[in-house]
Amino acid sequence: MKQANGHMAKRILVVEDNDLNRKLFCDVLKSQGFVTEPVGDGRDALDKARAFAPNLIIMDIQLPNISGLDLIEAAKKDPVLRASPVLAVTAYAGRGDEDRIRDAGAEGYLAKPVSIGPLMAAVRALLEG
């Protein structure tokens, strides 16, 4: 899918188990010209990511069945995915959490609730960086 300026639209994988948050993230990103691939179950995230070849991965850290941190670490070891920056989002932003998330390999971090302004600023910074 091409944007109006002729460039290919950036592809963003959204891994979020909360249906409302996942839809909100995808709707906001689509409204800004991005192509999104929503993933509700973290167990499917790596396979979907490999098939989708995202320019950016937005990763919820608290997922049922698998840790978002484990998924980030696995993505960073994957030859196909390791170049894709990861923006981690979490509702549990305690002391030391950001360090653990960055140690896992995430290039960006936002605490929930996520506002649209900071989300878009982080997305653009990671895609342009």
Give residue spans per PLM region.
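C-terminal output helix
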Residues: C26, V114-V123
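Charged docking surfaces used in two-component/phosphorelay signaling
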Residues: K23-S31
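Conserved acidic carboxylate
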Residues: E16
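Acidic catalytic/metal-coordinating carboxylates
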Residues: L20, D41-D44, S67-E73
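Active-site beta3 strand of CheY-like receiver
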Residues: F52-I58, L63
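Short hydrophobic/Thr-rich beta-strand motif most characteristic of the beta2 strand and flanking loop
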Residues: G33-G40, K48, L110
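The feature encodes the CheY-like receiver
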Residues: P64, E73, R82, G94
